[in-house]
Amino acid sequence: MRCAVVLGGYGNFGKRVVTALAADRSCRVIVAGRDLQKARAVADEMGGPAEAAALDSRATNLAAELQRLGANVVVHTAGPFQGQDYVVAKACIEARAHYVDLADARAYVCGIGELDVAARRNDLLVASGASSVPALSSAVVDMLRTEFSVIQSIEHGITSGAKPPGLATMEGVLGYAGKPLAQWHDAAWRTVYGWQDLTRRKYPRPVGARWIGNCDVPDLELFPQRYAPVRTVIFRAGVSMKVGMLATWGASWLVRAGLLSSLVRHVPGLRNTALLLERFGSRASAMHVTLRGLDAESQPISRTWWLLADNDHGPQVPCLAAIALAQKLLRGEVRARGAMPCMGLLTVDEILAVGRGLDLRTTVTAD
């Protein structure tokens, strides 16, 4: 029987991955992490199909433990990935288990290729960024690009509902507030700052207009190469509550001015505040991907793909690609080998099929 180990399987994202994988009774699913009690609690919730194991991602015997458990696929959900090294991925290669993570940290995802030779040597796939970015975002661009002879710009983003994400996710996305980041603009790299350059983006109902600002994601580095000769790649994100977005923007200026070193140490307090305000906010989230360029007759063309999520189902979306890829690996349906960012491994339909039953809808418009 094939076996999937979900590292961090009792966290916000990990639990969702476990729940989805455990629905297939033909494979073993192991909830893993440092806290065995929490792992057992999640495994017990599954009603029998999941097991629990104590695993420390920093342990020197991690590879041996994965081998002992019989892992075929490891899904690493224990973020934040900003500042992490590849110790888990290396252990998976040594244990001869495929590796999938939900990282959206730019340096982490873009650097995963350093493990390519080792992964190929052991006939494995090591895929980083099986999340909203770059897995879903690149799948959308791949789907839309068939209408274009040339893509000149890619502008995409995400706006979340009032339900706050987990602590690790907040630490990751607020860690670069006010910090410089490189953005591809008009065929040259320019410096912008995290959570600044606020833009008002109008989304279809039920979302409406939202403020979004600069975020540092792998797409900013990967897309200029993958979709060359694209001249501009921009990614922005935001939250539903205007006061929260403007507060983040204001705090980013304190970091940029050197009055604060980072917002990371303030995240617990910020999250507690967000939890108190949650009931006053929207339950709707959205993602958009806008391509502009030329069609086959060299005429200007623009297309926008929208993903609209209601009833607090938006936080499920970052897990969909990892679940889809893990399921395909467990079924032996993925031929790709090597270490790479998660692009070109899944289609939009394959990713969204995992979200069947959620309050999600998509549409494409010509702007």
Language model features: what each stretch is:
Residues 10, 33-36:
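Residues in the short beta-alpha loop(s) of Rossmann-like NAD(P)-binding domains
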Residues 28, 38-111:
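NAD(P)H-binding glycine-rich loop region in Rossmannoid oxidoreductase-like domains
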